[in-house]
């Protein structure tokens, strides 16, 4: 019967060890251990409403800590995989450099094999621009859909156009001379369809 208290002390030492670790060394199990220690200490304080409110706040903080630890673990794993890939690539280049003619392009240059189906097709900046534009268009679409829903439900009256007609009655026409603004996505994907506008 005296073994469980000894086990609790061992757990306590183990849990305190998790608290002593560097934040960069924490694992998800460490977060659970810390949560257990804090929960045990809160239970010892009693059931005062202030303790209960504090407990909910601590639970939220522990959830955020767990999410950060998971993100950090994923980032570390991605970096390890990238490091291993780079090691393999360097080893391949060393073998190729010894056997064939060597082309030194510099640190910021990259040789792209146009026959490789997995080659990068866009720069990182181009992809960022496309994603940013997509998010902007998505938010505009959501706003327009929300406004349309308000019109349909009768919360907003139809707007008057400068010509005195209601917007739903007005026809939108574009002149032949007006050029449509080319978006980044259109620029990037125009080469695929063979259109050069």
Swiss-Prot record:
It is found in: Cytoplasm, Cytosol; Cytoplasm, Cytoskeleton, Microtubule organizing center, Centrosome; Cell projection, Cilium. Residues 14-96 form the RH1 domain. InterPro entries: DZIP_RILPL, RH1, RH2, RILP_dimer. Residues 65-153 form a coiled coil. It comes from the Eukaryota. PROSITE patterns: RH1, RH2. One of its GO terms (biological process) is cilium assembly. The keyword Coiled coil applies. Its main location: cytoplasm. Gene3D superfamilies: 1.20.58.1770, 6.10.230.10. The keyword Coiled coil applies. GO terms for cellular component: centrosome; ciliary basal body; cilium; cytoplasm; cytosol; intracellular membrane-bounded organelle; membrane. GO terms for molecular function: dynein light intermediate chain binding; identical protein binding; protein dimerization activity; small GTPase binding. Keywords: Cell projection, Cilium, Coiled coil, Cytoplasm, Cytoskeleton, Protein transport, Transport. Residues 119-184 form the RH2 domain. Homodimer. Interacts (via N-terminus) with MYO5A, the interaction is required for its role in dendrite formation. Interacts with RAC1. Interacts with RAB8A; interaction is dependent on the phosphorylation of RAB8A on 'Thr-72'. Interacts with RAB10 and RAB12; interaction is dependent on the phosphorylation of 'Thr-73' on RAB10 and 'Ser-105' on RAB12. PANTHER family: RILP-LIKE PROTEIN 2 (PTHR21502:SF2), ZINC FINGER PROTEIN DZIP1 (PTHR21502). Involved in cell shape and neuronal morphogenesis, positively regulating the establishment and maintenance of dendritic spines. Plays a role in cellular protein transport, including protein transport away from primary cilia. May function via activation of RAC1 and PAK1. This is RILP-like protein 2. The lineage of its organism: Eukaryota, Metazoa, Chordata, Craniata, Vertebrata. The gene is Rilpl2.
